[in-house]
Each structure stands twice: as structure tokens, then as C-alpha cells.
Amino acid sequence: MKEDSIKLGLKENWQQFALLVIVNAFVGGMVGLERSIIPQLAEMEFGLSSKSAILSFIVAFGITKAIANYFTGRLANKIGRKNLLVIGWIIALPIPILLIYANDWAWVVVANVLLGISQGLTWSSTVVMKMDLVGEKQRGLAMGINEFAGYLAVGIVAFLTGYIAQNYGIRPYPFYIGIFLSVLGLLLSWIWVKDTKTFVSQEAKTSTILKNETVFWTTTFKDKTLSAVTQAGLINNLNDGMIWGLLPILLLQLKFDNNNIGIITAIYPSVWGMGQLVTGKLSDIYSKKKMLFWGMLLQGIAIILLPFLTSFTSLAALSALLGLGTALVYPTFLSTIAQATNPNQRAESVGTFRLWRDLGYAIGAIISGVTADFFGIQYAIILIGILTIASSIIIQIRMPKEAKFVDLVGILYKK
């Protein structure tokens, strides 16, 4: 495609955008495969009692996904977004097979190493490609739609695997979904997805944002907006790692069956996913700082309340509240990062952010696992809730008053 014929925008590129949304739903479904049943698999089939040992699969996933995120950002302009997406799906193919036939917990950890690499390559690629297609004005909406598809799929597949496990056993049937998702995701990406590098070149011609000499340092520490968002991303996934590993175990201790565990654990990513259709658009027109502050605060409150409630209704409501808080921040993270960086450095900056964000999975699993082993699950959950509230305070203090990056010149000329 020639640069002169390229037009940025959601409407102008709706076919490729819609295809990438579908692909990202399959990417999310691969994570949903594990959300409700892997901690149970650890206790019931492998006899693991140490919470740190059980959460080792999340540590493996988080570290490898974080590293894959970073290198996807670094290599996107060199290797190509589509090529990285296809490689990610190829790596995903053996994951459900390993989970079906694993006779040792180490194989489950290996499967999650592959899952982390695959997720880093596929999800990061689809995120960056959608940013490339739509341009600056609709980027929040685009990220909302992207994350909606991904995390709604997480919720749906988490529910389905919980239901199948309840009626037909934890293995092998729930993991057949993963075989379907990985094969179809690979075919769609390989045959129909088109690379978006030329869109970046087109947008870079009109960008007024200066390039940074050190993208990693600027995103992580130097820039107040970028660093505030980055720490919040880490804490967000830190608490998500804890929820992923400990919530099913907490619900097992409360004597919920697999079906109800599947429902409660599915509500959180489902609300998270669906809510982003609204919050993504809001991040284009409303204060990003306020959305990030209130989102992290809501998450922290919901998490701290978890150990004190025992009924299905109250826990389902908290799961929904946690999902709402996450929906407020997730598309806002990405749209803020994208708008604060030069188009030619966007992929690397997003990759740096996603490196730290997804290291949160590993850090959260380690902190909550060790705390749960020494003091109990309830104390681990409360500690993570406190850290999440602290993150909201950091946003309030460090992030500039407004981070909307409005194109004032464009607005004046339109008038």
C-alpha cells in the first residue's frame, strides 16, 4: 500500500480493524483457558499445597510475557507487526496439548512459558497495529474495543472451562477450546491480516512530539506521565496475578463448586472487557488522570473487601466492581502512552510499558504466594489491595494535572 493512499481512522480501516479485534479475542481466549481451573488442577491432580508452588505458573507466564512485550516493541519496525503476530500464534499451538497430557507440574509451567511468549507477541502486535490504523483522535476508543474483545473472551472462556470442568472433568475437555483458538487465530493472522508499518510513516509526517534518545528510561522513570502510567500498569497486573492464582483457591475454601467458581472468576474479566467499550471512548474526551486514579482506587477497595465476604452474591458483586475499576484504567494506560510518544517510537514505548505491566503478574504471584504461605490467603489479598490504593495515590501526586494532549491547532482551524 502506497503512503499517499493511506487514510488514518477507524471508519477508513474498519475491515482490518475488525479482523484484528477478532484475532485479539482469540488471544484473550487462550488466557481464559486457565483462569478458573489451573489453580484447581494444581491442588486436585498434582497435590500441590504450597501457594507459592501453585502460583509458579503465573510467575513463569508473567516474566516471559513481559520480556516478549518489550522485544515485540523493539522489533516491530524491523521484523514487522504481522510477522511477530504469526510467530506468536505458532508458539501457541502446543500449549493446550501440554496442559492435556502434563503428568508433572513442571510441564504446566513450561506451557505457561510458551503462553507468556505467545501472548507478548500476539497481544502486543494487535495493540500496536490498531493504534497505527486509527490515528490519534480515536485511539482511546480503539484501545477500548481491543481490550473489550480480549478480556470479554477471557471471561467467556473462563466460564466455559469452569462449566466443562464441572460436568466432564478438569482434563482433557476444557483444553480442546485452546486447540480451536490457536489454529483459527494462526490462520486468520497468516492469511488475512496486513502489516501496518506504512501507517506509522504517514502519521509521523505530521507528529509534533519529539523523539526520545532513551525510550526505556523515559517511559520508566523520566517522564512524569509515562512513569506514573507505567507504575500503575505494574500494580494493576500485580493484583490481577493475585486474583488469577488465589481467588479460585479462596472460593474452594468457601466450598463453592467448579460452576460457581467459574462464574465468579468470569465476571471480573467480563465486566473489565465490556466496560472498556465505554471507558475507551471516555479516555479520548475526559481527564485521563482522573480515570486512572479512580480506577486504581476502586480496584484496591474491591480487593481489600474480598476476604470479608462469603456469599455468592457479594463476591460476584465485588468481582464486578474489580472489573469496573480495571476497565477504567486499561484502555487509558495505552492511549496515554501512545499520545505521549512519537509515532516512530510508539511501539517501543508501548513495549516498555507492557514489560513493566506484565512483570506485575510475576511480582504479584510471588508476593501473594509467599504472604499466603506464611500468613494466610486473607492477608495476602489485603496486602495487594493496599498496594493498589497506594498506586492510585502515586498517580494523583506524580501525574500532571491533565494528560489529554489535545491538538489545539487542529481545533482552532476547524472552528
Give the positions of each predicted feature.
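Juxtamembrane intracellular "pre-TM" segments in multi-pass secondary transporters
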Residues: M1-W14, D195-V229, L408-K415
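Helix-loop boundary and gating motifs at the non-cytosolic
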Residues: L10-G62, S227-A228, A232, N236-L254
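Short hydrophobic/alpha-helical segments at membrane-entry points of transmembrane helices
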Residues: L20, A106-N112, A228-V229, T313-S319
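Residue-level signature of mid-helix packing/kink "hotspots" within the transmembrane helices
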Residues: F61-Y70, G155, P269-L277, Y361-A362
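Structural signature of the two symmetry-related core transmembrane helices
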Residues: N83-I97, K290-L305
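Cytoplasmic helix-loop-helix junction between adjacent transmembrane helices
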Residues: V113-Y151, T336
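C-terminal membrane-cytosol helix-exit motif in multi-pass small-molecule transporters
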Residues: F180-Q202, S391-P400
